[in-house]
């Protein structure tokens, strides 16, 4: 009998990650058991509204949580099979300099305002690859040219404030990709950019990802952006992943009421004239989270057990998971439990 091939090892795997913060009003959990994985060469979109824990998740991966107010209570983070969450922060920072890179929301604060952009990129090559000043500068100019900065040799001498928002974000992308990372984390990379520039930046990220064969985690609340670039999607709500799976499966047959609510709350070209249905209520306060399923106070299909029993992620189809007691009903669109007490 021929043994089955070994399962492919994810490039990044996060399991049961719990992160707490100490604030002026008390201690609260920003992440409550987050689990997901990213395979080499794929794009995972982490989708959710503001405050769902998307950015905290990736900052935990990058070891960028504030030291004095945040702490990881439990969970593991593995990169290429190595458990980096158990290693000193220095090891994670080493990986973030060479293997994992991040594009932040605000390009202006991501760059040093008093250092020329070419010098900021060249410094990466000098420190990490021990290149000469001349060669490092040439690499920096080539990187700016690669991301579409016109007249890159001249613009490399400019300071961040001399670039428009869209061009400044291209500089940040050039810096992130300078050392050819295997994983790029893009945290709301088009925030504060106009619609046309947003599309240009997302097209650029997609082209560069395909050219370099790297994996990408895209943090966003925009369903349209996810549909354009992602292979898989993880939906977050109240500090946990409530659904994950292949993009088309999650979009075509969402298995969690929150995901279905997101789909029904935005216009869809294939449903002209369809009335939009907002999700009722507000996200829970992290200081006073609900018992049971975190979505039950807003859920149209909640039953009594949803108020007491927290559902775990379970498989509903190949590669498709949802944290809902009634995932099958939600997937088929049959509201058999709506209004049940």
Positions of PLM-derived features:
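P-loop NTP-binding/switch modules centered on Walker-like glycine-rich loops
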Residues: 63, 185-189, 193-274
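Conserved ABC transporter NBD signature motif
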Residues: 72-83
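Conserved ABC ATPase "signature" region
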Residues: 82-83, 135-154, 263-264
